[in-house]
């Protein structure tokens, strides 16, 4: 990759965020992973509000990886909010959740999610998810 693509990771699991970062490196990709803990922080980040006002430090992401079940605001709340923001509608949102319930997958798509991946059980699964994300949304992995 010639430039560091900003990817917003919205997830309350530091272990999953770590495994995602490691999987991107193992795939030969080094995007700029920007991590926020919940939907409320994601809305602040995307709006450029509170501590995220400086767009040179906090650029709009080229892709967002969004968990569903989080404190304060969940992923579905973020998707509903995004529907009201035409200026942010072009950011692809990939759901990355531990939920494999078909109802959650369908709800995410109805609310505008671009894709949906279930969180894998181990590091090798994260490698596969990242390769799929890279193939669809980023430069090709090694």
Q: Where in the sequence are the language-model features?
A:
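Residue-level signal for the "D+5" position in two-component response regulator receiver
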Residues: 35, 72-73, 110
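C-terminal output helix
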Residues: 41, 121-133
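Receiver (REC) domain active-site loop signature in two-component systems and cognate sites
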Residues: 68-70
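Hydrophobic/aromatic residues positioned on beta-strands within the core alpha/beta folds
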Residues: 94-96
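Short, glycine/charged-rich "phosphate-handling" switch motifs in NTP-dependent
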Residues: 114
């Amino acid at each position: 990759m010639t430039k560091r693509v900003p990817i917003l990771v919205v997830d309350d699991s530091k272990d999953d965020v770590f495994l995602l970062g490691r999987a991107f490196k193992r795939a030969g990709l080094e995007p700029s992973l920007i991590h926020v803990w919940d939907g409320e922080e994601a809305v602040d980040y995307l709006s450029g509000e509170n501590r995220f006002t400086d767009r040179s430090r906090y650029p709009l992401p080229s892709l967002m990886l969004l968990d569903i079940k989080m404190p304060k605001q969940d992923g579905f709340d973020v998707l509903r909010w995004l529907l009201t923001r035409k200026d942010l509608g072009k950011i692809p949102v990939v759901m990355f959740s531990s939920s494999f319930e078909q109802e959650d997958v369908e709800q995410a798509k109805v609310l505008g999610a671009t894709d949906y991946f279930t969180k894998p059980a181990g590091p090798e699964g994260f490698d596969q998810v990242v390769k799929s994300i890279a193939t669809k949304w980023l430069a090709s992995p090694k």
